[in-house]
């Protein structure tokens, strides 16, 4: 029989690593509570049509990377490759953005893309999503950027990340620019890399995002998207930059930043780092003001961003910003297996009365000698002994494991007071 192993591109979070996730998730919740965003929990499976209509048929994600399948009813379903589309579907289906309502939401969970696995890029990956609906003005643009900035400051990594900004303008602006870009690239068709040639027919703007040096040299003299953007949108983008200056948020303009999802409009941004090699983007987002009505809802202003949690953890680890793991328990009980009905009741009462304590014991209940060895290995500060003699006398034995002191005795009815000290 063949050995069962994990699916390629998927990862187990082992017990020794789970504290890293708990640390990061606690910081995420701290920041989002500060900005009064509400958590939502979304299904990992959606109808395939949702992503075709939102992310885009021609996008790399939909055309090459989604996990698609049919259920027993013949419905075409997809493991979610990103979270925004599902969040918009939820908002529409539950009438959360009608009649001028506003929503500030966040979620965190696994996403799935069939990509070549490498460090920081996996086929199942966890993503934090932050989404806001019903806000038209610049203030919400600044707030979502400030949320990411605040998280990076809370984690102690703000000096190692860079905010990159661009504006994609309106859909009409992009159509006009796309025609100008195609016209410019015509003479260079044979010199473009293979992926860029494919994008000429499907999604020409994505050529701007090419990492191939030769293609980037060709693009150096290409028309600039900013020159095709309406005056009002250009002014809004300029004002956004001015406000970021006032807030003290460092940024740089990136004219080639276009994002890989078709639903973005207006402002787009990424937070990047030079500490993770080719997987430099750790946060990306922007406005998607047309997506809600494209999916059947009322026209609703919308903006959001996503953070790759694994990449963020890799960065924290690389920079030494993760706390040391503390698996040590506070109290280790050493019990007589012949008297468990009494001693376990005492232990459980203490757990209920002092829930902040980490309490452990040897559930195999070997000899006292073997239990003391396990107590020493547990890292506990104190061992509490409850054997037949202790039960007969009404006193628990107390041994401070990290100090060279004689064993003490404490009456059972004083144990809670003793442990609270």
Swiss-Prot record:
Its main localization is: cytoplasm
Q: Where on the tree of life does the source sit, at the highest rank?
A: Bacteria
Q: Does the keyword Nucleotide-binding apply?
A: yes
Its recorded reaction(s) are:
tRNA(His) + L-histidine + ATP = L-histidyl-tRNA(His) + AMP + diphosphate + H(+)
Q: Any idea which GO molecular function terms this record carries? A: ATP binding; histidine-tRNA ligase activity
Q: Which GO biological process categories is it annotated with?
A: histidyl-tRNA aminoacylation
- State the top-level EC class: ligase
Q: What is its EC number?
A: 6.1.1.21
May I have one GO cellular component term?
Answer: cytoplasm
The UniProt entry, under HAMAP family, shows: His_tRNA_synth (MF_00127)
Write down what this protein is called.
Histidine--tRNA ligase
Q: Which organism is it from?
A: Francisella tularensis subsp. holarctica (strain LVS)
């Amino acid at each position: 029989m063949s050995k069962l192993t994990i699916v390629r591109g998927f990862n187990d979070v082992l017990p020794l690593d789970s504290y890293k996730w708990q640390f990061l998730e606690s910081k995420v919740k701290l920041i989002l509570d500060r900005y009064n965003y509400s958590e939502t929990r979304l299904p990992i499976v959606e109808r395939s049509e949702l992503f075709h209509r939102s992310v885009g048929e021609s996008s790399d994600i939909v055309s090459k990377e989604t996990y698609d399948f049919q259920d027993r009813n013949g419905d075409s379903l997809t493991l979610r490759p990103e979270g925004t589309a599902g969040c918009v579907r939820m908002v529409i289906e539950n009438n959360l953005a009608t009649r001028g309502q506003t929503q500030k939401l966040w979620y965190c969970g696994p996403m799935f893309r069939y990509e070549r696995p490498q460090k920081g890029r996996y086929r199942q990956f966890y993503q934090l999503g932050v989404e806001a609906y019903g806000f038209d003005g610049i203030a919400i643009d600044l707030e979502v950027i400030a949320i990411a900035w605040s998280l990076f400051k809370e984690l102690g990594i703000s000096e190692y990340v860079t905010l990159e900004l661009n504006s994609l303008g309106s859909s009409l602006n992009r159509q006009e620019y796309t025609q100008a870009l195609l016209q410019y690239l015509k003479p260079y068709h044979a010199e473009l890399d293979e992926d860029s040639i494919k994008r000429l027919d499907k999604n020409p703007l994505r050529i701007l995002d090419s990492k191939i040096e030769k293609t980037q040299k060709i693009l150096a003299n290409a028309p600039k998207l900013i020159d095709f953007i309406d005056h009002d949108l250009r002014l809004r983008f300029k004002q956004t930059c001015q406000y970021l200056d006032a807030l003290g948020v460092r940024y740089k303009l990136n004219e080639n930043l276009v994002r890989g999802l078709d639903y973005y409009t207006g402002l787009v941004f990424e937070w990047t780092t030079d500490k993770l090699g080719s997987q430099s983007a750790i946060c990306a987002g922007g406005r998607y003001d047309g997506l809600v009505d494209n999916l059947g809802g009322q026209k609703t202003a919308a903006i959001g961003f996503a953070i790759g949690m694994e990449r963020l953890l890799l960065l924290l680890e690389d920079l030494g910003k993760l706390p040391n793991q503390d698996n040590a328990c506070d109290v280790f009980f050493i019990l007589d297996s012949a008297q468990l009905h009494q001693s376990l009741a005492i232990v459980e009462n203490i757990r209920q009365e002092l829930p902040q304590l980490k309490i452990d014991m040897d559930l195999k209940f070997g000899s006292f000698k073997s239990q003391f060895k396990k107590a020493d290995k547990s890292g506990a500060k104190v061992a509490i002994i409850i054997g037949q003699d202790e039960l007969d006398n009404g006193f628990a034995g107390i041994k401070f494991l990290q100090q060279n002191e004689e064993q003490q005795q404490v009456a059972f009815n004083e144990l809670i007071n003793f442990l609270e000290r």
